[in-house]
């Protein structure tokens, strides 16, 4: 399948290319060549390889673009913001605290029962 954009990395299992949206300069997607809907479906060997490639590219992007850090993330299912139903990992370089990207982890610790959540997770 033709990828509209600039491919920055490719091997037998995956490719990485600049996201057309460029949330920040250097926003890159790492994508397996085999179709998986999201992280829940990815073969563990493929996922391990994708993480290694993501780490390499994140270091390369931070160094070569003078970024101060990066967000590395994926979305699983529509409720989590997945709009493309093919697994991919976002590498979003961060340059400063005012680059208009906000990932907010609200503290709800007073509202939840951690023991109950823990028990539900571990009952799987």
Where are these regions (language model features)?
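HIT superfamily nucleotide-processing domains
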Residues: 2-124
């Amino acid at each position: 399948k033709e990828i509209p954009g600039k491919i920055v990395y490719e091997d037998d299992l995956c490719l990485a290319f600049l996201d057309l949206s460029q949330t920040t300069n250097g926003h890159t997607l790492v994508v397996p060549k085999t179709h998986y809907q999201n992280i829940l479906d990815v073969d563990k060997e493929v996922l391990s390889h994708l993480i290694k490639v993501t780490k390499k590219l994140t270091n390369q992007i931070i160094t070569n673009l003078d970024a101060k850090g990066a967000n590395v993330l994926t979305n699983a299912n529509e409720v989590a913001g997945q709009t493309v139903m093919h697994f991919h990992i976002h590498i979003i370089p961060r340059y400063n605290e005012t680059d208009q990207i906000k990932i907010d982890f609200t503290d709800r610790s007073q509202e939840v029962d951690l023991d109950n959540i823990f028990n539900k997770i571990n009952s799987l």
